[in-house]
UniProtKB/Swiss-Prot annotation:
Cellular component, GO annotation: cytosolic large ribosomal subunit
Record GO terms (molecular function): rRNA binding; structural constituent of ribosome; tRNA binding
Role played: Binds 23S rRNA and is also seen to make contacts with the A and possibly P site tRNAs.
Source species, domain of life: Bacteria
Gene that specifies this protein: rplP
A Pfam family this chain is assigned to: Ribosomal_L16
Keywords: Ribonucleoprotein, Ribosomal protein, RNA-binding, rRNA-binding, tRNA-binding
PROSITE patterns registered for this protein in UniProt: RIBOSOMAL_L16_1, RIBOSOMAL_L16_2
Region described as Disordered: 1-20
Species in which this protein is naturally found: Pseudomonas fluorescens (strain SBW25)
Family: Belongs to the universal ribosomal protein uL16 family.
Designated name of the protein: Large ribosomal subunit protein uL16
DNA-binding is among the record's keywords: no
Amino acid sequence: MLQPKRTKFRKQMTGHNRGLAQRGSKVSFGEFALKSVARGRLTARQIESARRALTRHVKRGGKIWIRVFPDKPISKKPLEVRMGKGKGNVEYWVAQIQPGKVLYEIEGVSEELAREAFALAAAKLPLATSFVKRTVM
């Protein structure tokens, strides 16, 4: 599971997830990519689950890049605990996703196989996504 090795602070405030993705919105490593068209949060488990679906479908062919990293801690108080007494412990880590963010990239496979693999991966994610190709500059 992905999570930071160390952080400056253990817990974070909830904050807002506004705007569009400026960084990480272009296909920069692979040939094809899975791009988010919605806003939301991806947990480390969801990122790993989609990665497994991708790698299993392409088998040994192709190289895969994960372009998102869960760096935001989400805390939760235990069940049946009264309010107050401080913020709960960190339960899991999430990556905040804005529309236009590239989530996964792949290269070394045909477009048809890439589309199938990304369809399987997208089914594991709670966001609406789209398939994009690299544009030659």
